[in-house]
C-alpha cells in the first residue's frame, strides 16, 4: 500500500513538473492597415497592446481609399482601421470583411491649421487639403468649403495631398500656409503641438465616424481579435481622447 501511494505521488509530481515546464502558447502577429489620421494614436497604442498581451502588431499607414484598394487586391492585412464608415461597409459587402466584427472606434475632428501661430486669420497663398476621393478628411474639407460658398474662390489656390499626413506636411514645410487637417495630427495630450488652428464646426460637414473592421485573413488570428477588443477598452480610449478624438454614445 505504501509503495502504491509512493508511486502515485511520484507520478503526480512528474505530471505537475511537465505542466510547469510546458511552453506557453506562442504569441501571434497581426497586420493592421491604419488610416493616416490615426497614425499618432497608433504609435502609442501598439506598445501598450503588445506589453499587455504579448502579441505583435505590424502597422501600415495610408489614405483610407488607398488602403481599401490594397485590401481588395489581396494585401495581407488582418484588421482595417478606416477613416470613415463607408469603406469598411464596402469591404463587408464584398465578403472581404467579417460580419459582426466592425464598430466605430472614434469620431474625428477637422481643423484649419497653420504652422505659424499668427496665420489662421492672416494672409495666405496656398490651402492644402487631402484628396477627397481617397481621404475622408479631404471630403470633409470640400464639404466645409461648399458650406461657406468658397470652393470656386479658392480652387486655384488649393494643393492636394495624397492623404492627410502629406497634407499636414505641405503646411508644416511652408508649401502651403494653411491646411485642413485632422485634429489628431496637431494635438497631443490635450494640447496643440504647434502653430494655430480653428476647429471647423461639426455641422459644416458629415460626421467623420471611423470604423474598425476584422478582415477575413484575420478571422482566426488571436492577435487581430484581441486588438479589436483592446481598441474598445478604456485604456485605448484614454489615448485616443488625448489626440482629440470623440466617441459614439454607448449602444449607437
What are these regions (language model features)?
Residues 8-20:
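Bacterial N-terminal signal peptides
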Residues 25-73, 81-85, 89-252:
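Exported/periplasmic ABC-transporter solute-binding proteins
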Residues 1-3:
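N-terminal secretory signal peptides that target proteins for export/translocation
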Amino acid at each position: 500500500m505504501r509503495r502504491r501511494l509512493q508511486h502515485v505521488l511520484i507520478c503526480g509530481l512528474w505530471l505537475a513538473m511537465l505542466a510547469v515546464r510546458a511552453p506557453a502558447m506562442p504569441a501571434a502577429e497581426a497586420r493592421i492597415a491604419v488610416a493616416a489620421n490615426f497614425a499618432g494614436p497608433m504609435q502609442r497604442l501598439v506598445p501598450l497592446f503588445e506589453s499587455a498581451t504579448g502579441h505583435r502588431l505590424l502597422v501600415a499607414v495610408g489614405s483610407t481609399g488607398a488602403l481599401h484598394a490594397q485590401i481588395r487586391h489581396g494585401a495581407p492585412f488582418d484588421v482595417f482601421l478606416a477613416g470613415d464608415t463607408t469603406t469598411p461597409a464596402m469591404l463587408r459587402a464584398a465578403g472581404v470583411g467579417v460580419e459582426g466584427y466592425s464598430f466605430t472606434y472614434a469620431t474625428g475632428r477637422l481643423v484649419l491649421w497653420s504652422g505659424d501661430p499668427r496665420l489662421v486669420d492672416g494672409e495666405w497663398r496656398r490651402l492644402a487639403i487631402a484628396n477627397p476621393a481617397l481621404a475622408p478628411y479631404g471630403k470633409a474639407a470640400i464639404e466645409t468649403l461648399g458650406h461657406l460658398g468658397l470652393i470656386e474662390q479658392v480652387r486655384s489656390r488649393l494643393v492636394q495631398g495624397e492623404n492627410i499626413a502629406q497634407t499636414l506636411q505641405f503646411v508644416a514645410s511652408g508649401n502651403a500656409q494653411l491646411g485642413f487637417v485632422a485634429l489628431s495630427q496637431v494635438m497631443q495630450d490635450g494640447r496643440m503641438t504647434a502653430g494655430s488652428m480653428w476647429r471647423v464646426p461639426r455641422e459644416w460637414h458629415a460626421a467623420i465616424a471611423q470604423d474598425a473592421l476584422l478582415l477575413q485573413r484575420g478571422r482566426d488570428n488571436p492577435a487581430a481579435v484581441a486588438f479589436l477588443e483592446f481598441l474598445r477598452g478604456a485604456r485605448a480610449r484614454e489615448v485616443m481622447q488625448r489626440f482629440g478624438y470623440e466617441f459614439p454614445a454607448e449602444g449607437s
